[in-house]
């Protein structure tokens, strides 16, 4: 077999019959499969050993040669080669067809490639191939021209003779009639008898005339058909064709079926055809030109690729290896077989029957029928169901053809090539492991033993516990005591990977150091649950084992959970305390007035109390029970940095140094909390709400190395659990208190609601007004009950503690529990005007229960739909962006995009831009940021972190130019400087990082949180799409629902207000032609926008508009934006619109991820004029290829091509990728492969999918070419100390994670800069 590492591209083409015979190891002549008695393959059948190889290793069919020593011998009795049985997976056979057949992909595909090549309509082609019409293949024009006059004379003679014959017959009949009439008259017959007789005679004469006329017409038809006869002409009338052959057989040839197509192909001159088509394109117009363009695509493909079009008509059919279409015996003695065997058997049966009929010299009509059936059976084999009714097996199930084996989720590509199963893996239920450190996981002993079995066995032999591998295996299987010690030794510092499905982003797989645990459940660290989206209600996780030293190093450095604290989507920490831990820290840092031992100033009768000289003294007091953790006290601190304002007050300009004492007004709990933070971090004297905790961890991640952050969050977790236990926060029915004022509040609002009802019954309000009024009233009522609830609850109520600390839940839920549920929506998303007045504590009435479940069920159904839709969106995003990899350090471009940092308000102060987090943060500066005095605040090429942004704002800079992937000039992929900081590591992105996939995951992962439904904006008006459908609409570049027109030019508006429509005319400033927009529906409403004087009002007559400005409410069409304002604007428009949807749901994704996808949507250029290049007008070309080809042509002083940028939706862009492997594994597999084969496409294997499919290392991360040849070699010391067990003490964090002398890889943040 091929070694995948020795080729860099994969080409696909058309196989001719010659190729098929060369691949083949023999011809399959019989439809037999295996002998049902001996169960051995039949000779010359579909499983024949002579053709495909032996069924048993090193053993021929008849048994004459058995053993490996006869390797390579071909048995003279049975003709089987003695070799391995696995050759039955790779050896092909073939079937020699008695008549050629066309390949259904090229005939039936849309467009029909055969039809375009031969310039035949698909309908006509079908008639020819399936023997419903004859086609003329050649005409001897010269001979016909030379002998035309002779033939015409002959034809005239024949006509004359027909006419003469007719005249003579009529003459004779007329005379006979006269004579008979005379005789009748003589006999004295009556007049009506005579009349009848005459009518009969005239009828016969009429028939004679008609018969002669038909004969003359037929001759005329034959003659005119013959004189106009041309190649590719169809003749449907069988008799006409027979006559033509009889009379003029030497002047032309014709045939039906695939043979005729083959004949036409042989005479087809590709070069001449391409030239004539180019001529038509140059001079033609309209339909003719379009048709020529489409045909030229196919013709040029054959011309350039050197493919022979004969490959579309087959003389032989390949038979795939038998192991790929196996036949297995079931328990009952029956056989289960692959559908392909049935399809092959039909082909062979029909082929053999056809051979026999031809040998017997059967009549044409029978032979043709058999040929048609052969064609249909080959069609069914290649693509069952593409034409006519599919061939069905037992139970009316359509058989799976070769195409079906490739297609869809269960096809070869997605099931077996992109979704392989792996060994060294296991799965089990997860339980929480609060005692673990962040980089550890608990692995069940039995599972670990099975996973590490080979390692344990080798180590047992090394330590002489076992003599050989076999006995070591036996020891492991019997679980002898020594085995556990060895296992403990083997797993030390050998990381494992944990994965939870669905893996929506890269943090769904992380590496951990395993710790052996009893039981059968995997223990998971509580802080990584957020990243895995795991909970402990029965979730399962899979464990994988990295084997090689390189894999272990990558797992440890790149994937260890303590190195993956930040979210790749937003760059903010994901591993932070949640739920109980938040509650615990919140409890710990709460200050309670007048608690035990609180500070009391001195009075006459007592000295000052509640003052402590050190935290230790305060802790002793707490241990004695005279001080509460939450009491306000004064304490002297020496080892903690004071907050900035206190530092300035106590220590002035010199600042605080470790050891300097200062006194804090705080609580013991807060002092204990601050001891968890790293040295030098300013004292935090606040109550720890979840948001405050998040801000602290975020700050730590910006300022300290990852290892410190990991240690800190671990300490916070331990403290959180410890104090949550001691806080006594539990929930019971007694904690749910119904506010006593609830009844009187509701009575008051009931009265108001009754008034509205009466007005409605009197007719003073219509239905909609009544509903709106009731909704308003009940919203107010709900708010007031909520407020009463707030006032009624004590501060230390556990439910309030849980909600206020940010641990979980919100006030709405508390209100539903204890106050009232309030208004609920119906499935359309409208409020039902009757509220649910009861709370869950009191219980709901039947009606309330019903309307409440209504909404809840809608929610569940929505979630299920959303998950599927969001998954599909992620798949399309990954596909379109999978080859965006960081390819170089800097593309040296001068271009960039301008981002706003702040808005200057009239009084001169700056207001920080709301979305600075996702736009400017973590970017590389594209130009020096200079203040008004000309000082450079931040230099070009610097990374914009939080401190830099603060400095820019302090200097009064409102906008900066930053580098962006939208303006990156790297050919394939992007450069590190344009991409900027990697959100997951907080450093400049490494070369080789697969930023495309990270972008797709960052956008797709929160997809399930987006809403499904389209919401109404302002009651009436068109539906404005929102949520997931809107994101899809944008990424697929569809024309939006409720499309709003945009101004094509800058100028003044003339607004005409009609009855149902507006008409807007823009008079351009430059005096050009006026632009008119009419039939603008009034339901859509005019756009509100800011005017020069700062006021906001609706667009009105005489307003001034800028180019690209939206004129109506709704969404602009991105294709219009591209046409009017160009590619840069449409990119920014798409990024902004996508962000709007995510921000509405409170999801933070950095702009750069969306930019990566948008860049891929605008990669192509459509050719308008091909100049001197090879491009065809109207074709889509990659921008990089377009520019390089133009440079080449200009250098050779030719005419460059002209192109226009195109916006493609992500599905279309994925299918238009250069890699046919990637496109085929995405969607429309047969269409992609058909096209690729005709064009003889070559896949350069640049993306990730292609490499996964053929089993190479992906060209990303450490698999990138520049790192390919780095070898890892352990040093002697490392070898010597490979197995020393680290002691798992409590303080497991040492500078390099573990106090062992073992070969631990230090977990500092590796800077890869020196490898550049």
Curated annotation (Swiss-Prot):
Zn(2+) 2 binds at residues 891, 968, 975, 978. SMART domains: RPOLA_N (SM00663). The keyword Disulfide bond does not apply. Belongs to the RNA polymerase beta' chain family. HAMAP family: RNApol_bact_RpoC. GO terms for molecular function: DNA binding; DNA-directed RNA polymerase activity; magnesium ion binding; zinc ion binding. DNA-dependent RNA polymerase catalyzes the transcription of DNA into RNA using the four ribonucleoside triphosphates as substrates. The gene is rpoC. It is an enzyme of class 2 (transferase). CDD domains: RNAP_beta'_C, RNAP_beta'_N. Mg(2+) binds at residues 535, 537, 539. Keywords: DNA-directed RNA polymerase, Magnesium, Metal-binding, Nucleotidyltransferase, Transcription, Transferase, Zinc. Its cofactor is Mg(2+); Zn(2+). Coiled coil: none annotated. It comes from the Bacteria. Its EC number is 2.7.7.6. The keyword Transferase applies. SUPFAM superfamilies: beta and beta-prime subunits of DNA dependent RNA-polymerase. The RNAP catalytic core consists of 2 alpha, 1 beta, 1 beta' and 1 omega subunit. When a sigma factor is associated with the core the holoenzyme is formed, which can initiate transcription. One of its GO terms (biological process) is DNA-templated transcription. This is DNA-directed RNA polymerase subunit beta'. Binds 1 Mg(2+) ion per subunit. Binds 2 Zn(2+) ions per subunit. It catalyses: RNA(n) + a ribonucleoside 5'-triphosphate = RNA(n+1) + diphosphate. Zn(2+) 1 binds at residues 60, 62, 75, 78.
């Amino acid at each position: 077999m091929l070694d995948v590492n020795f080729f860099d591209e994969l080409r696909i083409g058309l196989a001719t019959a010659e190729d098929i015979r060369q691949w083949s190891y023999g011809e399959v002549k019989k439809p037999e499969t295996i002998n049902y008695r001996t169960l051995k393959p039949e000779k010359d059948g579909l499983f024949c050993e002579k053709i495909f190889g032996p069924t048993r290793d090193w053993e021929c069919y008849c048994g004459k040669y058995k053993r490996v020593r006869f390797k390579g011998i071909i048995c003279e009795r049975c003709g089987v080669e003695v070799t391995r049985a696995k050759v039955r997976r790779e050896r092909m056979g073939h079937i020699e067809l008695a008549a050629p057949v066309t390949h259904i992909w090229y005939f039936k595909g849309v467009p029909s490639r055969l039809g375009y090549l031969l310039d035949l309509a698909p309908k006509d082609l079908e008639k020819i191939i399936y023997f419903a019409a004859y086609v003329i293949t050649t005409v001897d024009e010269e001979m016909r021209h030379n002998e035309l006059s002779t033939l015409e004379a002959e034809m005239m003679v024949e006509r004359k003779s027909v006419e003469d014959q007719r005249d003579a017959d009529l003459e004779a009949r007329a005379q006979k009639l006269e004579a008979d009439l005379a005789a009748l008259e003589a006999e004295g017959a009556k007049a009506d008898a005579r009349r009848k007789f005459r009518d009969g005679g005239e009828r016969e004469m009429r028939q004679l005339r008609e018969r002669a006329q038909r004969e003359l017409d037929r001759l005329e038809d034959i003659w005119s058909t013959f004189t106009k006869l041309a190649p590719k002409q169809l003749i449907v009338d069988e008799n006409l064709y027979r006559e033509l052959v009889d009379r003029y057989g030497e002047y032309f040839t014709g045939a039906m079926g695939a043979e005729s197509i083959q004949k036409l192909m042989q005479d087809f001159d590709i070069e001449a055809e391409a030239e004539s088509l180019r001529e038509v394109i140059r001079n033609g117009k309209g339909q003719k030109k379009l048709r020529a363009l489409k045909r030229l695509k196919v013709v040029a493909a054959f011309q350039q690729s050197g493919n022979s079009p004969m490959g579309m008509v087959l003389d032989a059919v390949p038979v795939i290896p038998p192991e790929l279409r196996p036949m297995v015996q079931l328990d009952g003695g029956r056989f289960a077989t692959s559908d392909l065997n049935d399809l092959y058997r039909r082909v062979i049966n029909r082929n053999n029957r056809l051979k026999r009929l031809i040998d017997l010299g059967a009549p044409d009509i029978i032979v043709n029928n058999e040929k048609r059936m052969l064609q249909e059976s080959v069609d069914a084999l290649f693509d069952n169901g593409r034409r006519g009714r599919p061939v069905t097996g037992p139970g009316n199930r359509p058989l799976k053809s070769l195409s079906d084996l490739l297609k869809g989720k269960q096809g070869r590509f997605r099931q077996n090539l992109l979704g392989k199963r792996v060994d060294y893996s296991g799965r089990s239920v997860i339980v929480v492991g609060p005692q673990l450190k962040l980089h550890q996981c608990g692995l069940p002993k039995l599972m670990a033993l099975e996973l590490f079995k080979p390692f344990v066995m080798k180590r047992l032999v090394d330590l002489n516990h076992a003599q050989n591998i076999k006995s070591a295996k036996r020891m492991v299987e019997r679980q002898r005591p020594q085995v556990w010690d060895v296992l403990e030794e083997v797993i030390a510092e050998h990381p494992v990977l944990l994965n939870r499905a669905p893996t929506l982003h890269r943090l769904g797989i992380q590496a951990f150091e395993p710790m052996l645990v009893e039981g059968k459940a995997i223990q998971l660290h509580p802080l990584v649950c957020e990243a895995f989206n795991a909970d402990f209600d029965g979730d399962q996780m899979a464990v994988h084992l990295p084997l090689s030293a390189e894999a272990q190093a990558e797992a440890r450095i790149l994937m260890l959970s303590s190195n993956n604290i930040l979210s790749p989507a937003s760059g903010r920490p994901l591993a932070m305390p949640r739920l109980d831990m938040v509650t615990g820290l919140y409890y710990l840092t709460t200050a309670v007035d007048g608690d035990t031992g609180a500070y009391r100033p001195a009075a006459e009768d007592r000295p000052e109390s509640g003052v402590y000289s050190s935290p230790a003294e305060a802790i002793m007091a707490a241990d004695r029970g005279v001080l509460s953790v939450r009491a306000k006290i004064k304490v002297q601190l020496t080892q903690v940095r004071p907050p900035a304002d206190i530092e300035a007050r106590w220590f002035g300009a010199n600042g605080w140094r470790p050891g300097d004492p200062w006194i804090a007004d705080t609580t013991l709990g807060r002092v204990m909390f601050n001891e968890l933070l790293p040295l030098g971090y300013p004292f935090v004297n606040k109550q720890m709400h979840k948001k405050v905790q998040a801000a602290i961890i975020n700050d730590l991640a910006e300022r300290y190395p990852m290892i410190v952050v990991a240690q800190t969050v671990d300490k916070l977790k331990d403290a959180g659990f410890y104090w949550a236990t001691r806080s006594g926060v539990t929930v019971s029915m007694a904690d749910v208190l119904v506010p006593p004022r609830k009844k009187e509040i509701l009575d008051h609002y009931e009265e108001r609601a009754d008034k509205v009802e009466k007005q409605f019954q009197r007719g003073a309000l219509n239905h909609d007004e009544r509903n709106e009024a009731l909704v308003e009233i009940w919203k107010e009522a709900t708010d007031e009950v909520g407020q009463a609830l707030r006032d009624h609850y004590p501060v230390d109520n556990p439910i309030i503690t849980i909600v206020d600390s940010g641990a979980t839940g919100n006030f709405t839920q508390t209100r539903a529990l204890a106050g009232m549920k309030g208004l609920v929506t119906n499935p359309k998303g409208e409020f039902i005007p009757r509220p649910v007045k009861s709370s869950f504590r009191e219980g709901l009435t039947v009606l309330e229960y019903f309307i409440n479940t209504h909404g809840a069920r809608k929610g569940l159904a929505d979630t299920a739909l959303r998950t599927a839709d969001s998954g599909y969106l992620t798949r399309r995003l990954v596909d379109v962006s999978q080859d965006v990899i960081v390819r170089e350090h800097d593309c040296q471009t001068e271009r960039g995009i301008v981002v706003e940092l702040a808005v200057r308000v009239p009084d001169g102060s700056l207001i920080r831009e709301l979305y600075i987090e996702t736009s400017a943060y973590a970017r590389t500066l594209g130009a020096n940021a200079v203040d008004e005095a000309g000082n450079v605040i931040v230099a070009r090429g610097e990374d914009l972190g939080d401190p830099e942004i603060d400095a820019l704002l302090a200097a009064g800079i409102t906008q900066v130019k930053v580098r962006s992937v939208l303006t990156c000039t790297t050919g394939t992929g992007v450069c590190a400087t344009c991409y900027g900081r990697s959100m997951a590591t907080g450093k400049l992105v490494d070369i080789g990082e697969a930023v495309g996939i990270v972008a797709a995951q960052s956008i797709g992962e929160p997809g399930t949180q987006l809403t499904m439904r389209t919401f109404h904006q302002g009651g009436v008006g068109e539906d404005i799409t929102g949520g997931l459908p809107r994101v899809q609409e944008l990424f697929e570049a569809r024309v939006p629902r409720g499309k709003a027109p945009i101004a094509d030019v800058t100028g003044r508006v003339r607004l005409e207000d009609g009855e149902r429509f507006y008409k807007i005319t823009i008079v351009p400033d430059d005096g050009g032609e006026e632009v008119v927009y009419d039939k603008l529906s009034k339901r859509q409403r005019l756009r509100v926008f800011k005017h020069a004087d700062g006021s906001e009002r609706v667009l009105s007559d005489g307003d001034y508009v800028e180019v690209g400005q939206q004129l109506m409410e709704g969404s602009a069409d991105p294709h219009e934006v591209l046409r009017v304002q160009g590619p840069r604007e449409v990119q920014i428009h798409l990024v902004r619109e996508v962000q709007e949807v995510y921000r509405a749901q409170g999801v933070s994704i950095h702009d750069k991820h969306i930019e990566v996808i948008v860049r891929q949507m605008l990669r192509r250029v459509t050719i308008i004029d091909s100049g001197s290049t090879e491009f065809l007008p109207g074709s889509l070309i990659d921008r990089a290829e377009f520019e390089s080809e133009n440079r080449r042509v200009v250098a050779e002083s030719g005419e460059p091509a002209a192109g226009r940028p195109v916006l493609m939706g992500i599905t279309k862009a994925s299918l238009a990728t250069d890699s046919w492997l990637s496109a085929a594994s995405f969607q429309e597999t047969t269409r992609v492969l058909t096209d690729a084969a005709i064009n003889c496409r070559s896949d350069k294997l640049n993306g990730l999918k292609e490499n996964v499919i053929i089993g190479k290392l992906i060209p990303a991360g450490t698999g990138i070419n520049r790192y390919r040849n780095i070898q890892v070699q352990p040093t002697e010391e490392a070898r010597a100390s490979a197995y020393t067990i680290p002691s798992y003490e409590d303080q497991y964090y040492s500078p390099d994670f573990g106090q062992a002398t073992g070969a631990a890889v230090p977990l500092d943040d590796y800077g890869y800069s020196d490898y550049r």
